[in-house]
Every structure is written in structure tokens, then in C-alpha cells.
Amino acid sequence: SEKKIESILQDEKISYKALPENISEAPYISAKAKKYNLSELPNPESVNYKLTTETSIQAILSKPVSFGKNITALKLNEFLEQYVYEGSQFKLWEINEEQRTATFFQIVNNHLLYYNINGYVKVHWNSKNEVFMYEHAMIEKIEPLKQKKIIAPLQIIDELYSKNLLKTGANIVDMKLGYSSLLQMPQAQLFTPTWEVRV
């Protein structure tokens, strides 16, 4: 029961913010990896595109874009809007200062598509904070399928705890519903609703 789970978590000093409510189901989704046609991509005069596979590209900017002193989420989002094909379909996931990269995941059905080689943008910059290249892959022909029952957030936390994936004193800062890959078929991919838990 919820009360029992809550008291176990309290004993273990595992804290969490307000949990998402009213999410009882979400659809499975099928989609296809986009096959690129280089002629449809934006800014051909300032970006040199290269197909790394038929479903992913590398885009090298002829003139690197300076981000000034700091690489910020705001500047990265503006860069995506301005330079990246379908940039508004991607959301920032992480900035890695050490590797000088920022990774964006594709938004599908208003939720993030987690760690999928067919749904991401990776932006690269040099030691002067100038963006010189990005990688791009995306899914298209997105079709919602049958609904899947969603496990309640509190039960997910309990499951993580019982599998020793949550340590005593852990603080859950965020929980969101997204999508992860369930099945890869020759003609399409199948995605399932998945909880993202940030600790």
C-alpha cells in the first residue's frame, strides 16, 4: 500500500518532491529512423553536411559560432533553433564541459526519447567556446499505438529501493515520463513509456 511504501521511504530518509499525478496510461509509439536527403537540410552555404550512415549526419560549420565566455542552455537552445534541422524537436539533456559536448534528445508525443541513436543531436565546441560541429539523427512517421498502463511514481520509487538502486538518504529531485526503445524491427522501431528518475 502507499502508506507502507511512504513509511519505508521515511525510515530510509529517502526524500522526493511532489510526484507526477494523473498519469495512468500512455501510448506505445512506432516510428521510423529518418533517411536524410542532403538537399533538404538548412543553411547549405554555411554548413557542410556529411552522411555518417543513411540515418545520421555530421554537420560542420564553415564558420564556428562563438558562445562567448560561457556555454549555457539558453545559448545552446538558440543555436538549435537557428542552425539545426528541426532543432525545435529536441530538448537539452546534458552539457559535458570536459568533453565540450551538449546532448539533446528528441521530443516524441510531448515526452523525451531517452538514449536512442535515432533521436538525438550532439553539439561540439572547441577550447574557445566556438561551436564547430553537430551530429544529428531523428525519428519520423511517429504513430501512437495501444495504451500502456503506467506504474504509479511511488511504486517505481519502491521498486528502485527494493532493487538497491536507491541508497539511504537519497533525494529524488525529479520524475518525468518519457520513451525508450522496446523493439527494433527492419521497417520501424517500437517505443514504450518509461519513467525518468533523477536522484
Predicted regions and their residues:
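Short, structured interface segments that constitute the first stable element of a domain
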Residues: 117-149
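Intrinsically disordered, low-complexity segments enriched in Gly and acidic/Ser/Thr residues
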Residues: 138-192
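Exposed beta-strand-loop-beta-strand "reactive/processing" segments of non-cytosolic proteins
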Residues: 82-127, 176-199
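Preferential activation on post-signal-peptide N-terminal prodomains/segments
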Residues: 1-94, 101-103, 108-112
